[in-house]
């Protein structure tokens, strides 16, 4: 059986961190993929580096995807993914752009692509509840995520989870089952989801 990976895509406050923690609790093979990050803001869950280092990796063909958001630069690098899967781990990637989901999916793993969704009001409540200092920026990103989904409505997903209707534990169990079953991807009713 080939190695597996999980992509969690969704707006801020959709539960990516919480669900990743639940996945690791269910099965220690699941491990958060810590993206490279250059710039200000939160450092937990990232490998802090410089923009120059990200550029160096990109020139060497080792960056699968990079993006800028919240005044910082982020990258998903092939060496770290290879190290995790080589150690028998199941990397869990947090994504905020469908283009990134598509780019990373090119890596030959059995990807389980999960769309996490919650309404704007839930994002606002969760971001305020966890003490985010940039709630307005995160609400702007919620709208960008919604538009990103509408712009890529044909993108197939293994699962679409309404995180305002499920506990993190329930969501993690659904994802774990999808990995165990080798769930494929199918086109979903994105327009109906984000209305």
Show where each model-derived region lies.
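Small-molecule kinase domains that catalyze NTP-dependent phosphoryl transfer to phosphate-bearing small molecules
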Residues: 101, 129-180, 186-195
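P-loop (Walker A) phosphate-binding loop of NTP-binding proteins
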Residues: 11
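Conserved phosphate-donor/acceptor-positioning beta-strand/loop module used by diverse small-molecule
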Residues: 92-96, 106-128
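ATP-dependent small-molecule kinase phosphotransfer cores
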Residues: 36-98
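Hydrophobic anchor at the beta1->P-loop junction of P-loop NTPases
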Residues: 8
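ATP-binding Walker
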Residues: 14
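Walker A/P-loop
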Residues: 17
